[in-house]
C-alpha cells in the first residue's frame, strides 16, 4: 500500500511538527492493525507531484490550518490535489484540520465547500471550528469529529517522559501575525 502524507512544510516549526507526529501516530495505527506491507511517502502541500499523487493508494492531509482562507491560499492546493484524487479514485482523509479564516471571502468559502463534496473525501476530523466544518460539509454525508492536534503527542513521539521537572523545554509552534 502506498500512503501519501501531505502537509505544509516551511520555516514554521509547528507545521513540521504536525506532520512528524501525524506520521508517528499513523505508524502506530498500522502496527495495531497488523498492516506491514506499506510505504509512506511525503509531499509538501505547495510542491504538488502528480506522479506521487496518482501512484498513491490513499492520501492523508496531516493536519493544521490547511483549510486556510487567508493570504496563504491553501485552498488552491487542496483544490488541485483533491481534483486529481477524485479523477483517479484515490481516497482522501483530512486529519485534525483547522480553518484559518482571517481573510475569508464567499469565493474561498464556496471553494472549500466544493472540495468537501468530492467523492474522494472519505473522512474529516478537525482540531478547531467544528461548527464551521459542519456548515461547510452540510451537503455531504461526512461526519465531522473533533480530535487534538497531532503535535499534542510530541512528548511521546520525542520520548520526553524522562525529562526532569527542573529542566524545561519550550517549543514555539504558533505562527505570528
Where does each model-flagged region fall?
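Active-site anion-handling motifs in enzyme catalytic cores
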Residues: 1-177
Amino acid at each position: 500500500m502506498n500512503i501519501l502524507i501531505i502537509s505544509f512544510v516551511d520555516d514554521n516549526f509547528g507545521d513540521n511538527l504536525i506532520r512528524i507526529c501525524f506520521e508517528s501516530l499513523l505508524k502506530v495505527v498500522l502496527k495495531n492493525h497488523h498492516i506491514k506491507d506499506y510505504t509512506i511517502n511525503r509531499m509538501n502541500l505547495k510542491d504538488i507531484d502528480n506522479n506521487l499523487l496518482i501512484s498513491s493508494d490513499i492520501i492523508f492531509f496531516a493536519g493544521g490550518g490547511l483549510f486556510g482562507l487567508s493570504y496563504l491560499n491553501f485552498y488552491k492546493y487542496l483544490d488541485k490535489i483533491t481534483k486529481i484524487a477524485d479523477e483517479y479514485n484515490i481516497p482522501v482523509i483530512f486529519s485534525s484540520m483547522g480553518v484559518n479564516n482571517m481573510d475569508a471571502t464567499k469565493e474561498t468559502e464556496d471553494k472549500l465547500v466544493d472540495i468537501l463534496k468530492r467523492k474522494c473525501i472519505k473522512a474529516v476530523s478537525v482540531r478547531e471550528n467544528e461548527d464551521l466544518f459542519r456548515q461547510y460539509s452540510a451537503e455531504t454525508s461526512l461526519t465531522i469529529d473533533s480530535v487534538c492536534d497531532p503535535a499534542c503527542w510530541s512528548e511521546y513521539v520525542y520520548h520526553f517522559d524522562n525529562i526532569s521537572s527542573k529542566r524545561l523545554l519550550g517549543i514555539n509552534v504558533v505562527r505570528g501575525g
